[in-house]
């Protein structure tokens, strides 16, 4: 089992799958009568190049900059986002790096433990080149259905992850997604 962010994580668990999404401008999707599961308001990509910890571990600062840039482009603050679908590979090195980057990008949030943190890898394993689209599909369905799916196999946080003093909590059961604003906003 993949145990994202958990103290008993044992590493990468492969899965097999593929995913496909159709991206359209909102006005075109509305005009064409398409089913709209979610709207992407902003995104960012980067390359951490020489900042990487190692070949297998990205840079905390570079990840945090990409997350913050996506928030800015979407016109959102960390407080607006109540669910994050993380990469969450369930490795002792990768999960703390990702959590540190998220914590840095959400540093302006005044609330503690208001934002659910999940990883589809706990449900279906790491789909390699399809891992990102699997997380996007999971999140789009969560937005559309109003339910945050459970992150499975989590017992207690990795010793390098301080959930208590962060904006995040690990969502271990399916739960209704009813943010105070009434608008479901997520990061992937």
Label each residue range with its predicted role:
Residues 1-188:
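Condensing-enzyme catalytic core of the thiolase-fold
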């Amino acid at each position: 089992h993949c145990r994202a962010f958990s103290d008993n994580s044992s590493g990468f668990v492969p899965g097999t799958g593929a995913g496909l999404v159709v991206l359209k401008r909102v006005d075109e999707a509305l005009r064409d009568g398409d089913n709209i599961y979610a709207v992407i308001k902003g995104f960012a990509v980067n390359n951490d190049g020489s900042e990487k910890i190692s070949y297998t571990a990205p840079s905390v600062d570079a990840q945090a900059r990409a997350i913050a840039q996506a928030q800015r482009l979407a016109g959102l603050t960390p407080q607006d986002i109540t669910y994050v679908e993380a990469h969450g590979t369930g490795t002792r090195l990768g999960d703390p790096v990702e959590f540190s980057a998220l914590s840095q990008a959400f540093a302006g949030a005044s609330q503690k433990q208001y934002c659910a943190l999940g990883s589809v890898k706990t449900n279906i394993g790491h789909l390699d080149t399809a891992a990102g689209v699997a997380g996007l599909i999971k999140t789009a369905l969560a937005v559309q259905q109003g339910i945050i799916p459970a992150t499975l196999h989590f017992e207690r946080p990795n010793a390098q992850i301080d959930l208590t003093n962060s904006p995040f909590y690990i969502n271990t059961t399916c739960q209704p997604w009813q943010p105070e604003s009434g608008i479901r906003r997520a990061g992937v």
